[in-house]
Amino acid sequence: MKTILGFKGLFYLHSLIWTCAGDWSAIQVHCTQFWFFARIKPTIFYNLYVNPDEVFLGDGCHVTHVLPNVYYEFFYHPHDCGIVTQPLQEVLLLKTKIRYISRDSTVRSEMPLSCVVHKQKCQ
């Protein structure tokens, strides 16, 4: 089971590297059991500039904050947007995707996102 999770992690990492062309600042993901946060650059998809109304989190959740030409932010509860919460032994794995749907053409693209929440142990 750990091997499968390791391969999935490598696949996600490879997808992130390929999509962002090595620019690690192109995306940031943070989460807790109460919120999911993603910040992306407008050029995250193949250095093609995307407008905030063309990019979505999960099942169609819109950008929640824009700093023009710098970044777009998504801030949602983990039960929103079709975010999948997968409980594992010591952690919760939150999985979703960033979707790009061009308003001027048929171009579409997706990038998987995941975030790990460490479970708090009661003492």
From Swiss-Prot:
Signal peptide start-end: 1-26
InterPro entries per the UniProt record, alphabetical: PLAC1_fam
Compartment(s): Secreted
Entry keyword set: Secreted, Signal
A GO cellular component entry from the record: extracellular region
Superkingdom classification of source: Eukaryota
TM helices/strands, residue ranges: none
Family: Belongs to the PLAC1 family.
PANTHER family cross-referenced by the UniProt entry: OOCYTE-SECRETED PROTEIN 1, PLACENTA-SPECIFIC PROTEIN 1
Function: May be involved in cell differentiation.
Name of the protein described by the UniProt record: Putative oocyte-secreted protein 1 homolog
